[in-house]
Amino acid sequence: MLTNHRSPHWLRHSARWPGFLVLALPILLFSPLAQAASAGELDLTSSLPGFIAVTLFLAAYVLVMAEEKLHMRKSKPVLVAAGLIWAMIGWVYVHAGLPDASEEAFSETLLEYSELLLFLLVAMTYINAMEERRVFDKLRAWLVEKGFSYRSLFWITGILAFWISTIANNLTTAMLMCAVVLKVAEGDKRFINLCCINVVVASNAGGAFSPFGDITTLMVWQAKLVEFQEFFELLGPALVNYLVPAIVMSLFIKNRKPAALEEHIWLKRGARRIVLLFLVTIVISVLCHTMLNLPPALGMMTGLGFLQFFGYYLRQSLPRSLERKRTRYSQRGDWRKLESLGSVVPFDVFTRIARSEWDTLLFFYGVVMSVGGLGFMGYLALLSETLYTGWDPVWANIVLGLVSSVVDNIPVMFAVISMEPDMSMGNWLLITLTAGVGGSLLSVGSAAGVALMGQARGIYTFASHMRWAPVIALGYVASVVVHLMINADSFAIFH
């Protein structure tokens, strides 16, 4: 790391760091990864361009938090902020005679983002493909048809949300389980609300111990701070985080049985094979990272190639498949299935890619590059010294988990990785856990909670979630205590 901290006389500013900490701290907690965000040769933390950069990012994030009211995509403000921040850095470094330093820092930050972009793009494509092949609809229909009691349904949707979120994003998982609850709940608002809270907590907890469960865990794994198999040490704490509030809430659910509903859903052709290809892709990406020391994105992109070949096979063989099914259904007199063949459309991989959450991916770029710029100016190194030197890392990580209930956990984790604190594996696992499950404390603390407020509008609300916040907080504390107890040895391990 270059730490010369030279600053041209025309950049010096009378304001000093302690007074600026009040403004900078909340901003930098909102920020991302960019391992290239190490402080540059020039210390710009007390300069006018530095103050402008922080103000730009703060203003952009205020607009992001007002996304619902402004009806403006969250990627817009951070994309502009990232461009302006790096433009100022480039201008300063060119005038200081150091153009290569800023170019190299930008390129390294962009490379880190690109690897994550490719990984997430493939994962989203597979999830979209499984959704289009009706894999999730089939699961929902199966749950609806079984006629489980309310208490059983509460536990089944929670447990499924916990495990599905280890490979699928918590947003998809939560909305799938909420759809089941809304279908069978017969307008029981209390039951719907408790199930929504349970699903949000479960999906966030499930993603906390899997490298594929959340963007935050993916980044910790890709940064080689925690090895793939080491994440599973968080399984016990994550289960405790989910089970403590779930057990308490289940006591308030009447054990009556709703009427069984009949819903016929057929998997589209190739659905099971796409699920298998997704699992194979995950295995390949893990092997690339652990055995070949190559980025996981390589394995994911290879898996995308497999999906494209399989999509080609589905398209080429579709006419023959339709003809065989028409003959079979006609002979059996199954007119319902015969009629459904008229709506069959060919599988197209690029349509699934186009349906990825591009606003999220572009927002991700804006935050990564913005914080990469702020880190290159020297702010993250300064904050790291304040937070992780002034405090015990355990307490710092617990507090940052609480911060993630208000601020999206992706920027929180990115900020920590960018600070590069010297922490044990146990502490890296701790921040992974707290940043992952801290969002459950408030309904707005995770994408799952925000989505369910819209899906169960007027039933699951910010206030209804807050009423159970003490129980959720109890689960948060219990999960931290369990981690400190059962994984005590990991706090002596440094990678």
Swiss-Prot record:
Listed GO biological process terms: sodium ion transport
Induction and repression of expression: Induced by hyperosmotic shock.
Annotated function: Na(+)/H(+) antiporter that imports sodium into the cell in exchange for protons. Can also transport lithium. May be involved in adaptation to marine habitats.
Top-level lineage group: Bacteria
Keyword Signal assigned: no
Protein name, UniProt field: Na(+)/H(+) antiporter NhaD
Gene: nhaD
Record's GO cellular component terms: plasma membrane
Organism: Halomonas elongata (strain ATCC 33173 / DSM 2581 / NBRC 15536 / NCIMB 2198 / 1H9)
PANTHER family registered for this protein in UniProt: SODIUM/PROTON ANTIPORTER 1-RELATED, SODIUM_PROTON ANTIPORTER 1-RELATED
Main subcellular location: membrane
